[in-house]
Amino acid sequence: MQNLGIAITGSGSAVPETSLHNEELSQLVETSDEWISTRTGIRQRRLALPTESLSSLAAAASRQAIASAGITASDIDLILLATSTPDDLFGTATKIQAELGANKAVAFDLTAACSGFVFGLVTAAQFIRTGVYQNVLLIGADILSRWVDWQDRRTCVLFGDGAGAVVLQANSSDRLLGFALKSDGTQNHYLNLAYQGTAKEILPNVKITQGTYQPVTMNGKEVYRFAAQKVPEIIDKALFEAQLTVDQIDWLLLHQANQRILDTVAQRLNIPAHKVISNLANYGNTSAASIPLALDEAVREGKIKPNDIIATSGFGAGLTWGAAIFQWGR
């Protein structure tokens, strides 16, 4: 098969209408707007109502991305959903396929937590580069508000809900300029949404485990230390593959985890603050949704323009981290 180029040709995003401000959180746990904002940069986050689903948010973001790419749902060959919070543990991508009417698309979920969008981007690119598919819909979406302990101020202040999507298409020139992916399972315990089973005897001498999950747990100091060290390193590696220098980057688009992490990574790469995209204050950490959500907002606001070079990096549970360098548009 002939190797093809890749272009990201459309973007979209969707968030729940319900907002929860820092001041309101102080009614739940011992905290304050000043405490949260100075440590995280977050001022509010969006929360999905009980009647809202991950698939509905993802489908709304996808419709925008498909429209902005100038194609229809019937043109989509593959749907990749990066999520850790599916509607159904068996998979939610097929549910989105049905909602969109993307009848010819293969659809499956991919789980890499907050790195999910970057891992999904690289995965989607391989299907296009090898000529298997022409049009891929990549979605990052999470509803972590359903999986946090709302009495734990170390985690409940951080997370919000949302979805973002992009369309990748085969292109005469390759706009994915470089990438690098890494994993380290020895540090898995620093950030978990872990299985928590309850032993149950269903017959004499026959025991099974009734499955459920415990709320998100995190060692914030270790996650910060990991991100501050590993993210600049992997962006440098992706830049080397792209044969570019830091000075050639137009925008730094990181997973929106914590403003201190964004600032530290930018400083270590010598990237000025005006090149750093951040919407963390309005949405909090939306996990796999954070990069495509921030990307779509920046495109719609006119910040990101055709041919701009973007360095993006996702990092989080696993531990996993990755970076990709791409040019916006065809």
UniProtKB/Swiss-Prot annotation:
Known pathway: Lipid metabolism; fatty acid biosynthesis
UniProt xrefs under InterPro entries: ACP_syn_III_C, ACP_syn_III_N, FabH, Thiolase-like
Lineage top rank: taxon: Bacteria
Region named ACP-binding: 256-260
The protein's enzyme class: transferase
Active site feature: C114, H255, N285
SUPFAM superfamilies (UniProt xref): Thiolase-like
Enzyme Commission code(s) on record: 2.3.1.180
Cellular compartment(s): Cytoplasm
Signal peptide: none
CDD domains in the record: KAS_III
GO MF annotations in UniProt: 3-oxoacyl-[acyl-carrier-protein] synthase activity; beta-ketoacyl-acyl-carrier-protein synthase III activity
GO biological process, one term: fatty acid biosynthetic process
One cellular component term from this protein's GO annotations in UniProt: cytoplasm
Stored HAMAP family: FabH
Task of the protein: Catalyzes the condensation reaction of fatty acid synthesis by the addition to an acyl acceptor of two carbons from malonyl-ACP. Catalyzes the first condensation reaction which initiates fatty acid synthesis and may therefore play a role in governing the total rate of fatty acid production. Possesses both acetoacetyl-ACP synthase and acetyl transacylase activities. Its substrate specificity determines the biosynthesis of branched-chain and/or straight-chain of fatty acids.
Family: Belongs to the thiolase-like superfamily. FabH family.
PANTHER family to which the protein is assigned, alphabetical: 3-OXOACYL-[ACYL-CARRIER-PROTEIN] SYNTHASE, BETA-KETOACYL-[ACYL-CARRIER-PROTEIN] SYNTHASE III, CHLOROPLASTIC
Protein's name in the database: Beta-ketoacyl-[acyl-carrier-protein] synthase III
Organism: Nostoc sp. (strain PCC 7120 / SAG 25.82 / UTEX 2576)
